[in-house]
Regions:
Chain A
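Re-entrant/interfacial helical elements at transmembrane boundaries that shape
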Residues: 41-51, 64, 79-99, 130, ...
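Transmembrane alpha-helix interface/packing and boundary motifs in multi-pass membrane proteins
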Residues: 27-41, 70-83, 158-163, 258-267, ...
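Membrane-interface alpha-helices at helix entry/exit sites of multi-pass transporters
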Residues: 58-62, 99-116, 287-300, 327-330, ...
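A structural-propensity feature for long, helix-poor, extended segments
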Residues: 68-79, 86, 296-321, 325, ...
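Short helix-coil transition sites and intra-membrane helix breaks within transmembrane domains
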Residues: 33-42, 80-91, 124-127, 263-272, ...
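Membrane-embedded alpha-helical segments of transport systems
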Residues: 69-74, 115-127, 135, 179, ...
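Membrane-embedded alpha-helical modules
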Residues: 111-227, 338-489
Length: 499, 169
C-alpha cells in the first residue's frame, strides 16, 4: 500500500493551478498535433519536446504525459476518419473504425475509442503503479551482465521480433548503434567517428536523431509522393454512445486492457501484437459477427483499449529498467536525460516526487483527454483538412526549431537534414525506424554495461554471463534466433485447424 | 498492397545501393576504430575499439545477407500513409527544393536570426510543396516565426537567436 500513498502524494503535487494548466496544455497540444495527418504519437512527442525545455522537470513531465496521451488519442482519430493509420499500432483500429465512420457511425467510433482509451489507460496506469515497484525491486539486484543481457534482448526484440523483415530490422538497429557510437568514448576519452569535427565530440543528441528520423524523414517522404487530390474526410458530430453501444463496448475495453498491458510491459511486446489479438478475440466473441467487416463497434473498442494499455505498460520497463521498447518511450527516455535524470531502478529512490507526480499526471491526462475530446472531436476533425503544403512546411519548421533549441548549434540542423534523408531512405526501402532509435539510445549504455561486466572478469568473456537472470535471457535470445528453424520441427507443423 | 508500376518489371535494384551503403558504413566504422589509440587498463580491459569493430563486421555481414535477400527477390514495402500516393515516382524537384530551403535555414539562422530564417524555411517549404498563395504563405510564415520566437525564446528561455533583429524584437 506504500505505492498508493506515494501516488496520493503525486496527486497532491499536481493539484496546483500551474501544474493543472500544464496538463491541460499538454493534452490539447498533444491531441492537436497528433490528429494531424502523417503525425503519429512518436513524432508528436518528438516535435513537442521543445515546449518542455524552459520548464522545471516536474512540470515538464506533467506536460509531457499530457502530450503523450493526447498524441495517442489524436492518432486514433486520424485513423478512424481517414483510414490510413500513421502508426502500426493503429492499423487495427482503422479497419473497423473507418468502416463505422463510412457507415455514418463516426461519432460512435470516436466515442468508443475515447472512452475505451480512458478505461484502458486508467486500468493500465493503475497496474503500472503496482507492477513498476516490483520490477524495480527485481532490477535493483541486477548486475552489469544482467543489464547487458536485457539490452541484447531488447535489441533483438525490436529488430527481429516486431518487424516483418529480420534483415531490414537488424540493419536498422546496426545503423542506430553506429550513430550512438559517435562522440567521445565515455571510458577512455577517445573520439570515435567524429571525423575531427569538434561539435560531434558530444555525440549526436537523441532528440536530433528522433526528430530527424520521424519528422524530417516523414515530411520528405510524403513530399516525394504527395497525393495531389485532397483526401475525403468524413464529417463527424459530437461523439456519443447509445445504450446498446455501451453494452457492446465495455467488455472489449476490459479485454483489450488486459491484453495490452502485459505486452507493453515486456521488452519484446509492443502494441501491434495485442491490438491484433484483441481484434481476433472480439471477432470471435461478438454476438454480431455479421457486422465485422462492415464496421463493428467491438472491433474499435478492443484494439483501441489494447493500444492504450500497452502504451501505459511500456512505461514499466522504461521507468524501472531504463529500457525503451517503443518509439515514444525512447523519446521520453531522451527527455529524461536532457534533465540529467537517469531512468532505472534508482530513479524511484532518487526522484520519488518526480516519478510519482509523473504517474499521477498520467491519470490526470487520461481524464482530461476524455473530458476535452468528446466535445472537441468535431474541431479536431477539422484539422484534418489543413492544406498539406502548410502542414508539411510546418513540420519542417517545428522540427528545425526543436532540433536547434537543444544545443543552439547550426550544425545540428545539417545533421537533422542528413538524418531526415536517412529516414527518407528507410521509408523508401521499408526499413523499420524503431530499431534505429532504440539502437541510438541503448547502444552506448549496452557498451558501458558490457565493458563493466568485462572489467569484473578481467576481460574474460565469461564475465558477460552473470547469474540466473542472464542465463534465462540468453536462453530466450537463443529461442528467438532459432525460432525459424524450430518452427519446422514436426511438433510445430501439425496441420492447422481452421479458426 | 499493389506493386508500384515502375517496380513490377523486376527486382527493386536500388536496394543494392542500400547494401553498398551498409557495407561502406561497416568499412568506415572499422577503419575509424583501428585509427584510435588502443587504450586498455585494468578498469577497462577491452578499450574503445572492440565494439566498433564488432558493429562494422556485423554491418558487412548484414549487407551480404541483405544482398542475397534482394537477389532472391526480397523487397521492403515502401511506407504508406495518409498523404502518400505510392503510384507516383519520387518527386525529385520537391525534395531537392525542400533540402535547399532546409540548408538555407541552417546557414541563415545565426546571422539573420530565427525569425527571418524560420520564415524563409516555412515559406519556401510551402512553396516547394505546391503552395501558390505566396502572400498568404508569407503572412503565415511571419506569424509562425514571430510567434514561436516570442513564445519560446522570450517566454520560455529556449535558445533561438535574434540575429539582425536583435534589439528590435
Amino acid at each position: 500500500m506504500e505505492n498508493l500513498s506515494h501516488l496520493l502524494d503525486g496527486f497532491a503535487n499536481i493539484v496546483s493551478p500551474i501544474n493543472l494548466l500544464m496538463a491541460l496544455i499538454g493534452v490539447v497540444a498533444g491531441t492537436a498535433v497528433g490528429v494531424l495527418p502523417g503525425i503519429g504519437p512518436a513524432m508528436t512527442v518528438a516535435l513537442l519536446l521543445p515546449i518542455t525545455y524552459g520548464l522545471e522537470p516536474t512540470q515538464a513531465f506533467i506536460l509531457f504525459a499530457g502530450i503523450y496521451y493526447g498524441g495517442m488519442y489524436g492518432g486514433s482519430t486520424t485513423s478512424i476518419l481517414l483510414n490510413t493509420p500513421g502508426e502500426s499500432s493503429s492499423v487495427v483500429t482503422a479497419i473497423e473504425g473507418n468502416l463505422m465512420a463510412k457507415a455514418g457511425r463516426a461519432a460512435q467510433a470516436l466515442a468508443t475509442a475515447a472512452i475505451g482509451s480512458f478505461v484502458a489507460g486508467t486500468l493500465a496506469t493503475l497496474a503500472l503503479v503496482f507492477v513498476t515497484p516490483v520490477v524495480v525491486d527485481f532490477a535493483v539486484g541486477l548486475g552489469s551482465p544482467d543489464y547487458f543481457a536485457i539490452m541484447m534482448l531488447a535489441f533483438l526484440a525490436v529488430s527481429i521480433v516486431l518487424g516483418t523483415s529480420r534483415v531490414r530490422g537488424f540493419a536498422s538497429l546496426l545503423v542506430g548503434l553506429v550513430i550512438g557510437l559517435i562522440g567521445i568514448d565515455r571510458v577512455t576519452g577517445q573520439q570515435r567517428l567524429t571525423l575531427g569535427i569538434p561539435e560531434l565530440a558530444d555525440g549526436i543528441d537523441v532528440v536530433v536523431v528522433a526528430v530527424g528520423i520521424f519528422a524530417v524523414g516523414e515530411a520528405l517522404w510524403v513530399a516525394a509522393h504527395l497525393r495531389r487530390k485532397s483526401v475525403a474526410v468524413i464529417p463527424v458530430g459530437r461523439p456519443w454512445l447509445s445504450r446498446q453501444d455501451w453494452r457492446r463496448s465495455w467488455k472489449p475495453w476490459l479485454r483489450g486492457a488486459a491484453l495490452g498491458f502485459p505486452f507493453g510491459a515486456v521488452p519484446a511486446g509492443g502494441a501491434e501484437v495485442p491490438t491484433f489479438l484483441s481484434y481476433a478475440a472480439e471477432k470471435k466473441l461478438t454476438k454480431h459477427p455479421e457486422e465485422f467487416g462492415k464496421g463493428a463497434i467491438e472491433g474499435v473498442a478492443g484494439p483501441e483499449a489494447a493500444n492504450n494499455a500497452s502504451a501505459a505498460g511500456s512505461l514499466v520497463p522504461m521507468l524501472a529498467i531504463g529500457l525503451p521498447t517503443t518509439a515514444v518511450a525512447a523519446v521520453m527516455l531522451a527527455a529524461f536525460e536532457s534533465y540529467g535524470i537517469q531512468p532505472g531502478p534508482l530513479l524511484f529512490e532518487r526522484e520519488p516526487i518526480l516519478v510519482w507526480t509523473l504517474i499521477a499526471s498520467l491519470f490526470l491526462g487520461n481524464l482530461l483527454l476524455l473530458v476535452l475530446n468528446l466535445p472537441l472531436a468535431p474541431a479536431w476533425a477539422r484539422l484534418l483538412r489543413i492544406p498539406r503544403h502548410y502542414l508539411y512546411a510546418g513540420i519542417l519548421f517545428f522540427a528545425s526549431m526543436g532540433a536547434y533549441a537543444v544545443n543552439a548549434k547550426p550544425l545540428d540542423l545539417v545533421l537533422l537534414l542528413l538524418l531526415g534523408l536517412l529516414g527518407f531512405g528507410m521509408r523508401r526501402f521499408g526499413f523499420p525506424v524503431l530499431p534505429l532509435i532504440v539502437g541510438v539510445i541503448l547502444g552506448p549504455r549496452a557498451e558501458l554495461q558490457g565493458r563493466r561486466s568485462l572489467q569484473l572478469s578481467g576481460g574474460e568473456l565469461s564475465g558477460l554471463i552473470g547469474g540466473p537472470v542472464s542465463y534465462t535471457i540468453y536462453a530466450i535470445i537463443a529461442l528467438i534466433l532459432l525460432w525459424p528453424l524450430l518452427r519446422r520441427l514436426p511438433i510445430f507443423t501439425k496441420p492447422r485447424r481452421p479458426a | 498492397m499493389t506493386l508500384e508500376a515502375e517496380e513490377i518489371r523486376g527486382k527493386d535494384r536500388a536496394q543494392y545501393g542500400v547494401c553498398a551503403f551498409l557495407a561502406l558504413t561497416g568499412v568506415a566504422v572499422i577503419f575509424d576504430a583501428l585509427r584510435i589509440t588502443h587504450l586498455t587498463s585494468s578498469n577497462d580491459p577491452i578499450g574503445p575499439r572492440p565494439v566498433p569493430v564488432i558493429l562494422g563486421i556485423a554491418l558487412l555481414v548484414t549487407a551480404v545477407i541483405y544482398a542475397v535477400d534482394v537477389a532472391r527477390g526480397g523487397r521492403g514495402e515502401p511506407e504508406a500513409g495518409e498523404d502518400v500516393d505510392l503510384t507516383t515516382p519520387v518527386d525529385r524537384r520537391t525534395v531537392l527544393l525542400l533540402v535547399g530551403f532546409f540548408l538555407a535555414n541552417a546557414a541563415l539562422i545565426e546571422p539573420l536570426g530565427w525569425v527571418i530564417s524560420g520564415a524563409v524555411l516555412f515559406w519556401g517549404s510551402a512553396f516547394a510543396l505546391g503552395n501558390r498563395h505566396h502572400v498568404r504563405g508569407l503572412v503565415i510564415a511571419g506569424a509562425l516565426s514571430l510567434g514561436t520566437f516570442y513564445a519560446f525564446a522570450i517566454g520560455l528561455g529556449v535558445n533561438l537567436p535574434a540575429g539582425v533583429l536583435q534589439g528590435i524584437l
